[in-house]
Amino acid sequence: MNMQETPGRTQPERTAAMRARLIEATLATLLDAGYSGTTLVSIAKTAGVTRGALNHHFESKDDLVVAAVSSLLTNTSSEIRSYAKSVQDGTLSLPGFLDRLWELFSGPFFMVTLEHLTASRHNPLLKTRLVLLTRDFHRALDETWSSFFTTKELQHPGLETVLNATLCLLRGMGVQTVLRDDPAYYKRLLAFWKDVLITHTGITHKAKERQR
């Protein structure tokens, strides 16, 4: 059912639905065509709407990109937070947590991230707007890391540093996937880092014990 066929919706609801539709189309276009290949015409086509309908909600390509990145970072932050909670309650081991993060950093989330990062290098206005969004994203990640400390069994003085180092590793691996399609190579790197995490935190064993 398209938007015109959906009865009983208020104007704010229709507006929110259209914006969500355009944001989803923007993310899909960035992933498929890259930032340079993303245009208002291509986004409208992907969304199945007219250019006029698009311009009613967003004035420029970068307005759409910023809105799309904001949505992407919010959803990803929520996803990572849910994984962290699973480690806390013992339903997910720390190596399992690393596997979940790698799925994010080797998939669409990170590929889209690469597009807006490289675009920002030569687009000062876009960079200024995205810096604010990424700052909020990293603040949310810091809150997620600190949540590990709320459970006594998971407290460790170097845990926050280890987890931030983990993100740096995954970002680097994610960039490398662009030119190196070698799953076995990345699997070895992940296995090595899982040993590092176990050595520095001991969380894996404690999580298993709570599952018994």
Predicted regions and their residues:
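N-terminal intrinsically disordered/low-complexity leader segments
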Residues: 1-17, 179, 204-212
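Helix-turn-helix
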Residues: 21, 25, 29-63, 67
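Solvent-exposed, amphipathic alpha-helical segments
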Residues: 21, 25-32, 79-83, 112, ...
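Hydrophobic alpha-helical connector segments
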Residues: 63, 67, 80-110, 156, ...
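Short, basic, alpha-helical segments at the C-terminal edge of helix-turn-helix-like DNA-binding modules
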Residues: 70-76
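Amphipathic alpha-helical packing segments from all-alpha helical-bundle domains
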Residues: 76-83, 103-114, 124-150, 161, ...
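Hydrophobic/aromatic-rich alpha-helical bundle segments in the mid-to-C-terminal region
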Residues: 125-131, 148-212
